[in-house]
Amino acid sequence: MKGAIPLVNSEKRKQLIIDTCILAGKIMLESGSEVYRTEDTITRIAANAGEPESVCYTTATGIFVGFRSSNYTQLENIPQRSINLEKVSLVNQLSREFAQKEITLPELYQRLTLLETDTPTFSISLRLRSEEHTS
């Protein structure tokens, strides 16, 4: 990828790792993922990005991520939640692609950013109507 951040543990890279972990976790929690699944995804992304000693604490309303190897710690408030298992599935798919080195860390972050803004959410009335037609 043009302009990719080098694989050295630079300050910018550490910040990108933590931003990517937080974004993935935020999308998952806001979309109805279980806390343990969110934490697992965050720690896997960090480990695959070169931070095997990450620390993650997640509740239904917040995410805390840090690295034991440095003073990097970040938190994110999760003020709202809904059910959008498509987003949860897509975050997991992107995480697997990153683990298999099919995409780079900057690509993962970019795709998560697009996923956060471009994946449609549906109103409750529309979801109920679709359930009526599938039942």
State where each predicted segment sits.
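Short, glycine/charge-rich beta-strand/loop segments that flank catalytic centers
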Residues: 60-63, 108-113
